[in-house]
Amino acid sequence: LWWGQHWYAITIGSALLTAFAVRVMWNVIPAMNASGTGEWDMTGGSDPWYMKRAIDYILAQNSHFVIDMDRAYPVGSINPRPPLFSWSLALGGVALDPFLEGDVHDAAWWSIAGMPAVFGALTVLPIAATCKRFFGMGAGAIGAWLMALMPGHVSHSTFALADHDAFVILFMSLGFYFWLCAVDSIGNDKLLEDSNWNPLHLVKGIRAAFKQHPAAMAQAILAGVSFATVALGWKGFVYGLAIVYAAFFLQTAINLVRRRDSMPVTAAIIVMMLTTFILPLPFYGNLQLNLIWDASGFQPLFYIVGFTIINGWIVTAFRDKPWLMVIIMGSGISTVLLGTLYILQVLELSNGWDVLTTGGFYFTKNKVFGTIAEAQAPSRGQLFANFGPLVFLFSLGMGLTSLWRGFKNRDPKNPSRLMGPASLVLAVWILLASYMAWSAGRFMFNATPVMAIMGSAAVVGLWRSSGVREFVKTWRRMGATSPRARFSSTIGAGRKHLGVPAIGMILILLFSQHAIYGIDSGIPRGEVGEKQVDETIYGLVPDVLRADLFGWSVMDGSPYTDYGVGEDNMTSCRGECWYMGTFGPGFNGAGWNQ
């Protein structure tokens, strides 16, 4: 009874603690003992070190690092990092300073190294909340553990990786959670009896939405605040809003054909977009930074907000007109707008066309991007391994299923099954995130939240469809009065319901593989912990399964080199571990540090 009341909180709490431990425990000592210097070190290349430079300036000058004279020397250039992430690390150092020896710069090292791991572990919570809200408590627990040990996420949120990735994904996940809640609860009932082409009619609809659906509109505002937080930490924030707009466009097209009112979802998305637009505007509008019309700054958001308002105005103003006429008119307006951008591009008056067609130049193909490793398409093995092969396939399958369900309303006979707008948002999110990850390695990390969400939904769906309820009934009917009876009942029920043991074996494979890859992602390459964990996993398998019987064994019986300092042992993997050594952060060598 007690476990039945508290199992979910215990499961989520243990996932949170495990996520933090995996990201921290093997990285603290190497981070504090840099090779060649014995001082602090960081992983992730040069980006974290520039972040450290910005934080040092904040601590020394008590102001944001705007102009860096060492960039584009001797002219100087702007600090390309938005302020919120670097300031959160700097203020973390200030908060820790009274409790640690040394000055604030020494205390800041703990904040710089530790906060990314904190942000990474906290991402478990919005993922669990999303899974629980839309797929049930079981999915929430599974989603939390999938995210806690997701290889692609662990490898970008470890201790001493002082980059904005973990911060961005935490608040991006929060933004999508609130937006999914908003579109799921706001519905498509008519807010206004009439439709009108006057743009002020949209304002009237937004007022009606606040009056009739205050909770949904509050969630839309919270989504906007979350996305704005991302904007103040990373200039590539627009990709999340582009996914939201793509789902909105598809939803309004469905509403047109089915004669439903799009005013509720239009009101919610306009409020959300404007919140995201207004909050970071003072930073991007700083005249020294000149980021308002920068292709990697605020310019893409102008297009997203503009298309959202125009799209919403068309589908609400002409709600009661024939849908074919509205689609033709909307296509005409879009053609004029896009054609204008293209002409301005040809006349070299604007680069808006390139910004739209290359995703703010993130998908551009030129010689410069050819020199950037993370801008290249990953190998298929790397892509599958970053999410877990089975998790990736399950998530894609669930995405296609959700796309189909997105065209339907919630079934009154099965209200727990997610359908409608929220299902459509999840489907568009997983499909676009998969395409982005397929196109460039830098986007694999961004796809991890939705992989965990849809992967957990797929696991729960498979388990329910395996016939587990009938299995339990058969098991009880066969008798469960003693350990022997329970064992024989399990065997008998498994024979009658073969789907349960089959799906059970698949899930064992999924979770064991996911856990091994996740732990491997948290261990720095070349560290002794890599070999120690590898030997521990090797020792979990009974020797009888590796025994060679008539030239055949259940598992690989090849000789294994144990951990140790002797001639026949190894202290690190050196590419010869059985389970570890595929992932993991890398600290700098003595040559770099000195």
Question: Language-model segments: which ranges?
Answer:
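Start-transfer (signal-anchor) and selected internal transmembrane alpha helices
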Residues: 1-36, 46, 141, 217, ...
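Active-site lumenal/periplasmic loops and adjacent helix-entry segments of GT-C-fold
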Residues: 24-134, 138-146, 150-171, 191, ...
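Transmembrane alpha-helices and membrane-interface helical segments
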Residues: 125-129, 174-182, 244-255, 273, ...
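Membrane-interface helix-loop-helix junctions at transmembrane boundaries of multi-pass membrane enzymes
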Residues: 204-214, 257-264, 320-330, 393-427
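Hydrophobic alpha-helical membrane-interfacial segments at the cytosolic entry of transmembrane helices
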Residues: 218-227, 242, 248-249, 258-284, ...
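Alpha-helical transmembrane segments at the extracellular/periplasmic loop-to-helix junctions
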Residues: 296-316, 328-408, 422-423
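Signature aromatic-anchored transmembrane alpha helix within multi-pass, membrane-resident enzymes
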Residues: 332-335, 462-522
